[in-house]
Design a protein with these regions (language model features):
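Extreme N-terminal tail/first-helix region
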Residues: 1-21
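Charged, gly/pro-rich active-site loop segments
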Residues: 2, 81-149
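Charged, amphipathic alpha-helical segments
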Residues: 4-9, 56, 111-114
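Structured helix-beta-strand junction loops
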Residues: 17-18, 63, 133
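Short beta-strand segments
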Residues: 18-52, 60, 68-72, 79-80
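Short helix-to-loop capping/linker segments positioned immediately adjacent to catalytic or ligand/cofactor-binding
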Residues: 22-26, 76, 114-122
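Short acidic (Asp/Glu) patches
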Residues: 51-54, 69-75, 106-116
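A short, polar/proline- and glycine-enriched secondary-structure boundary/capping micro-motif
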Residues: 57-63, 80, 147-149
């Protein structure tokens, strides 16, 4: 089932509101979860930057399947679980540094996260684009949906 217009709006609103997500990658033995800044494209592709020597980057090169969790627990009502959250699963790909795609996605990333600008001066910086294929969304306990993208 694909996302309908209302579901797209809900997912887009959550992604636009949040600046950090939990990126889960599969290592040789253990999964690894990292909280870090992200940005999203209008098509819901998720963008992350990281060092080329980071475990998460190396994990994604070997095992490109990734899960990303985005939520608003910082402003949600924890006692009643009124938290908007979504996990997205997809395939990660490396964005070639210096390419037109890199420059285009860098602009999207920095528009959302201008505080990340200094990292782009590091020659070891890498950018990953995750093209989601599945999403599970919930706002509280009743407003939920799952979809294939």
């Amino acid at each position: 089932m694909a996302l309908d217009a209302t579901q797209k709006e809900k997912l887009a609103a959550l992604l636009a509101q949040e600046h950090v997500a939990v990126l889960v990658t599969q290592g040789d033995k253990w999964p690894t979860a990292n909280l870090q800044a992200f940005a999203e494209t209008p098509e819901f592709d998720l963008l992350f930057i990281m060092g080329g020597n980071a475990d998460k980057y190396q994990n994604l090169l070997k095992h490109p399947e990734a899960t990303v969790l985005v939520d608003n627990r910082d402003v949600g009502k924890i006692p009643t679980f009124e938290i908007v959250r979504a996990w997205m699963q997809g395939i990660a790909s490396d964005v070639a540094r210096g390419s037109a795609e890199w420059e285009s996605l860098k602009a999207i990333f920095l528009k959302k996260n201008p505080f990340e600008e200094p990292f782009f001066k590091n020659d070891g910086l890498r950018m990953i684009r995750i093209r989601p294929s599945r999403v599970s969304y919930a706002s509280g306990l009743r407003d939920t949906f799952k979809a294939e993208l």
